[in-house]
Structure formats: C-alpha cells, structure tokens
Amino acid sequence: MARTVFCEHLKQEAEGLDFQLYPGELGKRIFEHISKQAWGDWLKKQTMLVNEKKLNMMNAEHRKLLEQEMVNFLFEGKDVHIEGYVPPEK
C-alpha cells in the first residue's frame, strides 16, 4: 500500500515519495511533506532552470541557487520564472 502525505505544495493528501531523494534536513522535510506528483513537477522545472540558465552542478553557487528555487517552489508556492517561457494553454 502506498504511503500518503499531506503535500505542502498541492495542499492535499497525495501519494508520498518511496524514499528520501535529497540529503540532509531539507531532504527529510521533502520526504515527509511533498508528494510524488509535486516532486515530479519540480523535476520538470529544475530541468528547465538548469538548461535555460546554463547552471553547472559542479559550481556551489549554482547548486545553492537551485536549492533555493526548489524550496520556493515546493514550500512557498512561488513558481519558477524562466525568461521567455510561456506555458501552453490548457
């Protein structure tokens, strides 16, 4: 049976992650309060950010920027701004 969490991003009960995907205290917080769906949404935004801003994960400043964007997206309800990107109409 799938584990459920109250997802802070979706603001509803949803299927939780199978295991902690991110290290440290932030990873524990994500595991306990973020759903699979919200994590998947973040991964799409993360890919766009890395590509559009040409982030290098070997650069500590770039990793810090990406982590802050992740916290903003998952816990603070702030969408990721990618210059020039217009989301498709639903």
From Swiss-Prot:
Entry GO MF terms: iron ion binding
Any one Gene Ontology BP term: cellular response to oxidative stress
Keyword terms: Iron
Lineage: superkingdom: Bacteria
CC annotations in GO: cytosol
InterPro entries, alphabetized: Fe_traffick_prot_YggX (IPR007457), Fe_traffick_prot_YggX_sf (IPR036766)
Family, similarity comment: Belongs to the Fe(2+)-trafficking protein family.
Role according to the record: Could be a mediator in iron transactions between iron acquisition and iron-requiring processes, such as synthesis and/or repair of Fe-S clusters in biosynthetic enzymes.
NCBIfam families found in the cross-reference section: PRK05408.1
Name the record gives this protein: Probable Fe(2+)-trafficking protein
